[in-house]
Amino acid sequence: MARLLQASCLLSLLLAGFVPQSRGQEKSKMDCHGGMSSTIYEYGALTIDGEEYIPFKQYAGKYVLFVNVASYUGLTGQYIELNALQEELAPFGLVILGFPCNQFGKQEPGENSEILPTLKYVRPGGGFVPNFQLFEKGDVNGEKEQKFYTFLKNSCPPTSELLGTSDRLFWEPMKVHDIRWNFEKFLVGPDGTPIMRWHHRTTVSNVKMDILSYMRRQAALGVKRK
């Protein structure tokens, strides 16, 4: 009887979308396609206060980590880790860019003007201020997705076979390369081409190790060419 009750509870959680998908259906990281004819430098975005349009070509020569963020997500704590990552790897040429989005569980419901105060006083709270650039809230999937996210998604295979629970995903049409949840990450290289894509549940510490490993390989190749 106890086992039956336990199984019933687990099924209810699965149907509600609170239990993670099988690890066999997802990968922590995917390498992006090579030989892309265009780069991220063809795009740009408005800062979260709406006062400045930043062309991404401004980051030429840098490694750029694109992250779709949300203030009321179970992964919002990653903000603190991303701050640490930005501080630690900035000397090696890493720039983190955050893009608030409300398409996953409606977990970024506020206006642009409310996002920074929410981060400071609510989640993560404790006076938290991101040390990386945040941009205006927008879509990363669907009919109104931002064009640079179309480019990133088409450049890199998805990390999971399944999109997730449809009643918690708010866009149409749904496509195989779509972002699965808040805090999915894309790394773009110094030449503007996408390199890696990470599953949202991949820890920031693992993302850091992957980035450092790639940087070391590139540095070694540079030495060999000399």
Swiss-Prot record:
- The enzyme's first-digit EC class, named in words, is oxidoreductase
- Recorded GO terms, molecular function? glutathione peroxidase activity; identical protein binding; selenium binding
Key words, A-Z: Oxidoreductase, Peroxidase, Secreted, Selenocysteine, Signal
**GO BP, sorted A to Z:** hydrogen peroxide catabolic process; response to oxidative stress
A GO CC term assigned to this protein in UniProt: extracellular space
**UniProt key word Nucleotide-binding:** no
- Point out the signal peptide segment: 1-24
Its EC number is 1.11.1.9
What is the reported tissue distribution? Secreted in plasma.
> Where, by residue number, is the active site?
73
Q: Which InterPro entries does the record associate with it?
A: Glutathione_peroxidase, GPX_AS, GPX_CS, Thioredoxin-like_sf
- Which ranges form a coiled coil? none
Q: Name one Pfam family in it.
A: GSHPx
Q: Where in the cell is it found?
A: Secreted
Q: Tell me yes or no: is Repeat among this UniProt entry's keywords.
A: no
Q: Which reaction does it catalyse?
A: 2 glutathione + H2O2 = glutathione disulfide + 2 H2O; tert-butyl hydroperoxide + 2 glutathione = tert-butanol + glutathione disulfide + H2O
Family (UniProt): Belongs to the glutathione peroxidase family.
Q: How does it assemble?
A: Homotetramer.
Entry function: Protects cells and enzymes from oxidative damage, by catalyzing the reduction of hydrogen peroxide, lipid peroxides and organic hydroperoxide, by glutathione.
The family database entries (PANTHER family) matched by this protein are listed as: GLUTATHIONE PEROXIDASE (PTHR11592), GLUTATHIONE PEROXIDASE 3 (PTHR11592:SF32)
Output this protein's name.
Glutathione peroxidase 3
Query: From which organism does this entry originate?
Result: Hylobates lar (Lar gibbon)
